[in-house]
């Protein structure tokens, strides 16, 4: 082959290869080194049982691929993510970081949500802040590929398992998840040395309950009560004695 022909072949090869710009490329990222270093979190909407569309909230450890939390709800909700975080705290401890989609991580108060219970952006972020958990977000699905692949795997496998177990409602489905996730981890999670973990010690149940709460600002009225969900509450001390506050003008 002469030089002219050789150069022509090289040019044809270059033209046939679509080279991406660096900013558009999403190369495979190596796993985290330690368990608890990064937890990828997401929710997926799917027909998990016939005639029902639920949202499965899941969390997977980036280091070993272990599913560390899973919970069904009818929508993508604060409760769903709180339930997942509760499972992580109880079974593993406090992770270092959550990595999730900007649409589903809860960092900023949404102006279109009037209810405190719906304001997941403020509530979840505040809970993580109190526990010392960093929240990192991305708008690129490929960046959190492990949880995306987990969603795909569960969508192909879990409906079959739910049908075989004769699950017909969301309450029983959440109970079933406990045994199913253990089975899934035994089959797919990597076996890492247990010392390679950065999970912090599990907080007390009192701290967990106080942290995974819906916080709401209310004003004491002239009758020394607060109003919440159209009900009035009278503040008391730990001993049950009435607590009175001066009302600001």
Where are these regions (language model features)?
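Mobile-element integrase/transposase regions
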Residues: 1-67, 78-96, 125-130, 224
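C-terminal, beta-rich DNA-binding module of retroviral/retroelements integrases
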Residues: 19, 181-249
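Alpha-helix N-cap and loop-to-helix initiation/capping positions
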Residues: 76, 115-119
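Acidic/histidine-rich, metal-coordinating catalytic segments
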Residues: 89-116, 141, 197
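Charged alpha-helix within mobile-element recombinases
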Residues: 117, 123-193, 199-210
């Amino acid at each position: 082959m002469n030089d002219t022909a050789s150069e022509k072949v090289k040019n044809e090869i270059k033209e046939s290869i679509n080279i991406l710009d660096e900013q558009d490329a999403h190369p495979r990222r190596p796993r985290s080194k330690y368990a608890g270093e990064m937890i990828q979190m997401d929710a997926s909407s799917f027909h998990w049982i016939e005639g029902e569309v639920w949202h499965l909230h899941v969390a997977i450890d980036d280091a070993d691929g272990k599913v560390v939390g899973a919970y069904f709800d009818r929508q993508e909700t604060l409760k769903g993510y709180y339930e997942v975080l509760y499972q992580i705290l109880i079974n593993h401890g406090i992770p270092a970081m959550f990595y999730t989609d900007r649409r589903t991580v809860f960092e900023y108060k949404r102006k279109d949500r009037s209810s405190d219970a719906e304001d997941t952006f403020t509530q979840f972020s505040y809970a993580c802040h109190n526990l010392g958990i960093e929240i990192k977000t991305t708008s690129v699905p490929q960046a959190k590929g492990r949880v995306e692949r987990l969603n795909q795997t569960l969508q192909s496998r879990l409906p079959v398992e739910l049908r075989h177990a004769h699950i017909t409602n969301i309450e029983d489905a959440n109970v079933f998840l406990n045994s199913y996730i253990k089975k899934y981890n035994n089959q797919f999670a990597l076996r890492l040395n247990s010392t390679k973990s950065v999970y912090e010690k599990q907080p007390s149940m009192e701290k967990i309950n106080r942290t995974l709460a819906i916080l709401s600002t209310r004003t004491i009225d002239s009758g020394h009560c607060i109003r919440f969900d159209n009900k009035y509450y009278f503040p008391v001390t730990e001993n049950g004695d009435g607590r009175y506050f001066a009302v600001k003008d």
